[in-house]
Amino acid sequence: MSENLSSFKGFEARKAAWEVIQAVGGGAFADVALERTFNLYSFNSMDKALITELSYGAIRQRYFLDCWIDSLGKVSAKKQPPLLRWLLHLGLYQILKMERIPPSAAINTTVELAKTHHLKKLAPVVNGILRSALRSKEKGLLLSKSNNPSLELAKNESLPFWLADELIAWKGVEAANKIAQAFNSISPIDIRVNKLRANLKEVKEIFDSSGIQNQVIPNCPYGLEVRAGVGEPRKWPGYVEGLWSVQDRSSQLIAPSLGPLPGEKILDACAAPGGKSTH
């Protein structure tokens, strides 16, 4: 069985996601690590979407997943070999956070990655922790609770404890939970139309005709919201031609709010790379 698993659908994508998680664990920026992986290997759009979801999801839920390792393993997460810790994150994220992936696929491919990538002796540990997590999920058993609401929020929503504590002090437990859940939600992609080359209506029509789901962003005269998970933005129509660029809606509001006038000199002291500067 072991020699055939590497040909299973999604195996190479999971391997690539693991590499991204490892890179970020070593200090790399997530988007840079992901881009490097896409440049190294040839993946179709579906595999790229899976890699993105697995890597970003596991990174986003790092503390939550560490808590599960602490709960189920004999060795705490931070004392695990980094390679094993990140692999467990990959498997646990699929089991605990991705309903569309069959648990058997998540467990088998993660164990196979351990066997074939320098963790063969620890493969039984991987198998045991993942199967324990699955049993706990099926029985409705969650992480052990404490009487500290800040700790509970930090564990369940994968936040630094200090941030959970500040949110509760600021907004109360209920509102803090909603804010934390928003932190972990998958955001749509916002784009800003280059008014020197196109207008909002033209770009919207181009996206509509290409099957890219989008909608106008309220109060952003040149902004469109695109549903996440529809492929690489650089391959969307109009990108190469410079009709639009990716820019968050909050950033799109900066230049109009400033109200620059012809002839004025304005210093953007935080430009990197300068999306707002070119607005």
Residue ranges with predicted function:
Residues K201-H279:
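Rossmann-like S-adenosyl-L-methionine
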Residues M1-R234:
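Class I Rossmann-like S-adenosyl-L-methionine
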